[in-house]
């Protein structure tokens, strides 16, 4: 079975527990924290995937590192260790965020711009794209892309809205080539 399918199953299980306990936001924050630490700390990743370190040692280590997270999240980490699936932790967190966003009718957007956007600009973009996508809210993450000449690119899920200068120039070029 592919890692994506397995990750989705774990995410769905966590989502059901979170919904039942009314802690969608808390689980999301905790999963993002655990994901961030796991992805950015190569030593942690190496330790947890070492076959010569016992499962009990790994669980004790996880309890020490992530002792502040909820019992459900910690138990999920233990299950991942038992099933030798800790490597799909980032995918589980991503799948959980997708499920939680669907439940709240929220979308995450990555906005690429030539410079950091002000809070007001982010808010305006969020409002405009919330209407356009039919979502209640859009959470904006701003990424500076110095390769842009101007304008912005907005990525929401698998869709890209290209309002960059390069995008406009490319569209003009296609039109000119088509009309030759």
Curated annotation (Swiss-Prot):
InterPro entries: ATP_synth_OSCP/delta_N_sf (IPR026015), ATPase_OSCP/d_CS (IPR020781), ATPase_OSCP/dsu (IPR000711). It comes from the Bacteria. SUPFAM superfamilies: N-terminal domain of the delta subunit of the F1F0-ATP synthase (SSF47928). GO terms for molecular function: proton-transporting ATP synthase activity, rotational mechanism. It is a peripheral membrane protein. It is found in: Cell membrane. Keywords: ATP synthesis, Cell membrane, CF(1), Hydrogen ion transport, Ion transport, Membrane, Transport. Pfam families: OSCP. One of its GO terms (cellular component) is plasma membrane. PROSITE patterns: ATPASE_DELTA. F-type ATPases have 2 components, F(1) - the catalytic core - and F(0) - the membrane proton channel. F(1) has five subunits: alpha(3), beta(3), gamma(1), delta(1), epsilon(1). F(0) has three main subunits: a(1), b(2) and c(10-14). The alpha and beta chains form an alternating ring which encloses part of the gamma chain. F(1) is attached to F(0) by a central stalk formed by the gamma and epsilon chains, while a peripheral stalk is formed by the delta and b chains. F(1)F(0) ATP synthase produces ATP from ADP in the presence of a proton or sodium gradient. F-type ATPases consist of two structural domains, F(1) containing the extramembraneous catalytic core and F(0) containing the membrane proton channel, linked together by a central stalk and a peripheral stalk. During catalysis, ATP synthesis in the catalytic domain of F(1) is coupled via a rotary mechanism of the central stalk subunits to proton translocation. Belongs to the ATPase delta chain family. This is ATP synthase subunit delta. It comes from Bacillus cereus (strain G9842).
């Amino acid at each position: 079975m592919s890692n994506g399918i397995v990750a989705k199953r774990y995410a769905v299980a966590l989502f059901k527990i979170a919904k039942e306990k009314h802690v969608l936001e808390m689980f999301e924050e905790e999963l993002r924290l655990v994901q961030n630490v796991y992805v950015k700390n190569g030593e942690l990743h190496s330790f947890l995937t070492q076959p010569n370190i016992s499962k009990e040692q790994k669980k004790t280590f996880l309890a020490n590192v992530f002792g502040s997270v909820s019992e459900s999240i910690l138990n999920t980490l233990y299950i991942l260790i038992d099933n030798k699936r800790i490597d799909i932790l980032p995918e589980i967190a991503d799948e959980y965020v997708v499920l939680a966003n669907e439940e709240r009718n929220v979308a995450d957007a990555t906005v690429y711009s030539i410079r950091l956007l002000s809070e007001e600009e982010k808010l305006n973009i969020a409002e405009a794209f919330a209407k356009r996508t039919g979502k209640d809210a859009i959470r904006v993450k701003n990424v500076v892309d110095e390769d842009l000449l101007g304008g912005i690119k907005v990525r929401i899920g698998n869709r890209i809205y290209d309002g960059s200068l390069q995008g406009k120039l490319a569209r003009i070029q296609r039109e000119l080539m088509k009309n030759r």
